[in-house]
Structure formats: C-alpha cells, structure tokens
Amino acid sequence: MTERARAKLLDLKARQEAGVHMMCPRCGMDTMKEPIHTNALSRSADVYVCDACGTAEAMLAFMKQDYPLHLWAAFQPVRPPADFKEHSARAVMDTVLRTQSDELRRLYQLCRDDPGNAEWYRLEAFESCPGLIELWPQPFQAKYQAADGAVLIRFRNGPDGGIQMAADVTDK
C-alpha cells in the first residue's frame, strides 16, 4: 500500500469515527446505516462497510479469497478533466511530453522498483496525469485518446542502465 492509499484509509477511518454519513467505501453505494457501528466491520481494513459488502467479504473469507483494497470504490481515482479527445494525436503527444513526462517517469520508476504496489501506483497515475485512459505497469505503457487516434508513451530500462522513453501515435 502506498502513502497515498494509507492517507485515504486514515481519512476514511477518521470520518467514520466522527460519524460522517458516507457511501460504502467498498462498493460506493449509499447503503450505510446510521449509526455507523451498526454496519459490518471489514475483514480487509479496519473500517465499516455496508451489510452486503460484509456478507460478500465473509463468503470470500470462507473460500480463502480476498478482494484487494485497490479495487474498493473509496480508492478509485478522481480523474482530472482533459479535452484531449478534441485535439489531434500529435498535439496531445506534444502536450503530454511537455507536461507529464516527468510524472510518468517517476511512476515508471516506482512500478519498476516496487512491483508489489504497481496497482496502487497505477491508480495514482490516473489522478496525476490528466487525459490518461489506460496504464499498464508491466511493460510500462501509458495511453491517451485523441480525436484522430491514440498516443502511447512507453518506458523501459536501457542497456546502459538509463531509462528510455518512446512516444508513438496510432491512427484510428
């Protein structure tokens, strides 16, 4: 779990302890009962979830399965707005390379060095890179949709140990 995810979890716990009415952190539905302690306590995290999610977690626990926290509604990214679908792929590529290449490089390094948290870094990418529609941590590739195609940004380790970046435009 990343620092961003830990901060969200701590904020969620604090809001629940304060008695703030909220959506179920697991499914995102407005099914939480008042007072908060009458809901199910999650087996995955020390927070309350709705009764349906509590039942689902109990069934998964019986089957010795888990529903990862990065799939919970509370941890899904809030995507910043972008109007890339109205511009040409070349213009989108220029904008992304100028404004987001450092952030994408940082995320690549995090995914490379800490592959166990790659899904958390992927969620972080959607919040910090406006217009990003897909991100694959391995091999690292970011995709942006444009009016006339898509822009793909890829990173890899070069033979000299440095990081190499490639940017391509694919037509519709």
Predicted regions and their residues:
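Short linker/helix segments within small regulatory modules
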Residues: 36-47
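Short, intrinsically disordered terminal segments enriched in charged and Pro/Gly residues
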Residues: 1-19, 61-101, 160, 164-170
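Residues immediately within or flanking Cys/His clusters that coordinate Zn2+
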Residues: 21-22, 47
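Short, non-ligating residues that shape and space the ligands of small metal-coordination modules
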Residues: 33-34, 56-60
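Short, cysteine/histidine-rich loop/knuckle motifs that typically chelate Zn2+
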Residues: 25-28, 52
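Acidic, low-complexity, intrinsically disordered interaction modules
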Residues: 114-160
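Surface-exposed polar/charged interaction patches
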Residues: 65-69, 78-81, 94-102, 107-118, ...
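Conserved short hydrophobic patches within well-ordered secondary structure
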Residues: 47, 55-56
